[in-house]
Swiss-Prot record:
Belongs to the SHMT family. NCBIfam families: PRK00011.1. This is Serine hydroxymethyltransferase. The record marks 227 as: Plays an important role in substrate specificity. The gene is glyA. Its EC number is 2.1.2.1. GO terms for biological process: glycine biosynthetic process from serine; tetrahydrofolate interconversion.
Length: 411
């Protein structure tokens, strides 16, 4: 990208932008919620559209001069509906958290009971964590994974639903590596008369590519981010049945947001177009293939995977048998150029700021071009770095650098 203006006007920020690019170019990105946006997406984010205020919706704005950005938002909405087979799409949420908040405000009253996945078992902050608005405003009851299989036990979910009679059940996760059965969640909701919301932020790309069952036919509302496996800008998205569209839209604007970010909505439209291309399905298939292979290579080196494997773009690694915490593993691997994040594991005994595991994803490295054959080397570097953590790590830094040089970023 051309940074001639910022390099001249604000060299301090320009220097940090260049430093971050260098970090990304020379590092292996394994954070499951990150990806590498295309230059087309980034150009949209940096476009003239950032200048336009557009409170409201296409054809019903509170400002003049919106006839151009109306077209942008209409394209984004139509592409989102086509991509996921949805009746209605709202592309205005600034984030996934705000998308979830908008759904809650559409169908819940303060204090209503909601059933969501426990954060320590793979859920998200907005699925009822007591430190989050969701846990403060609503009465969340949590379900988790089975102690033995480390997968969702739908019989237990049903029992909790019958016992607590939630008005809403939230399906979806931020650290769950297995296929989620949305049909079973729908059946449970129908049995007790509850709404179903699916947070597919992590798996949206897989759903778009047909590599994970779609929640759209089963859920009343589906929320997502656009920057994880969808490989777009940082932002949110909501899909819903047409009968909820009017109430949902007014809970986003004027309910909880003012002006939409039109440059980001344009970038969302670009990413939806990219995801509609047949090549995106091939990309997502490689993401899953790489993730499965990386998991298998780690298992060969004595690592334990939560639920013993993966069906998607991420693996959760239990480090209890490696005599290292998630926090220390994250810091250690960062030193050699591998970024991932500490993560709680089922039956966690440590603080969420320390943890007993790490979460690993392959979306970003696959975008960059990493292939299945590279997963063995990545697993080997991770393993040897942890084993030799008290020794000189320079040779592992060089191995990371050598891998990265094979797959240049933004060149």
């Amino acid at each position: 990208m051309n940074f001639e203006h910022i390099s001249r006007e604000d060299n301090e920020i320009y220097a940090l932008i260049e430093k971050e690019l260098e970090r990304q170019q020379n590092g292996i990105e394994l954070i499951a919620s990150e990806n590498v946006a295309s230059e087309a997406v980034m150009e949209a984010m940096g476009s003239y559209l950032t200048n336009k205020y557009a409170e409201g919706y296409p054809g019903k704005r509170y400002y003049g001069g919106c006839y151009v950005v109306d077209g942008v938002e209409e394209i984004a909405r139509e592409r989102a509906k086509e991509l996921f087979g949805a009746e209605h799409a709202n592309v205005q949420p600034h984030s996934g958290s705000q998308a979830n908040m908008a759904v809650y405000f559409t169908i819940l009253e303060h204090g209503d009971t909601v059933l969501g996945m426990d954060l320590s078992h793979g859920g998200h902050l907005t699925h009822g964590s007591p430190v989050n608005f969701s846990g403060k405003l609503f009465n969340f009851v949590s379900y988790g994974v089975d102690k033995e299989t480390e997968e969702i036990n739908y019989d237990v979910v049903r029992e909790l639903a019958i016992k607590h009679k939630p008005k809403l059940i939230v399906a979806g996760a931020s650290a769950y590596s297995r296929i989620i059965d949305f049909k079973k969640f729908r059946e449970i909701c129908d049995e007790i008369g509850a709404y179903l919301m699916v947070d597919m932020a992590h798996i949206a790309g897989l759903v778009a590519a047909g590599l994970h069952p779609s929640p759209v036919p089963y859920a009343d509302f589906v929320t997502s981010t656009t920057h994880k496996t969808l490989r777009g800008p940082r932002g949110g998205l909501i899909l819903c049945k047409e009968k909820y569209a009017k109430d949902l839209d007014k809970n986003i604007f004027p309910g909880m947001q003012g002006g939409p970010l039109m440059h980001i909505i344009a970038a969302k439209a670009v990413c939806f177009k990219e995801a509609l291309d047949p090549s995106f399905k091939e990309y997502m298939a490689r993401v899953v293939e790489n993730c499965k292979e990386l998991g298998e290579q780690l298992v060969k080196r004595g690592f334990k995977l939560v639920s013993n494997g993966t069906d998607n773009h991420l693996i959760l690694v239990d480090l209890n048998n490696k005599d290292i915490t998630g926090k220390d593993a994250e810091k250690l691997l960062d030193e050699v150029g591998i970024t991932l994040n500490k993560n709680t594991v089922p039956n966690e005994t440590r603080s969420p700021f320390v943890t007993s595991g790490v979460r690993i994803g392959t979306a970003a490295i696959t975008t960059r071009g990493f292939e299945r054959k590279d997963m063995e080397e990545i697993a080997d570097i991770i393993n040897e770095t942890i084993i030799n953590r008290d020794k000189d790590l320079e040779k592992y830094k060089q191995r990371v650098k050598a891998l990265c040089e094979k797959y240049p970023l933004y060149k």
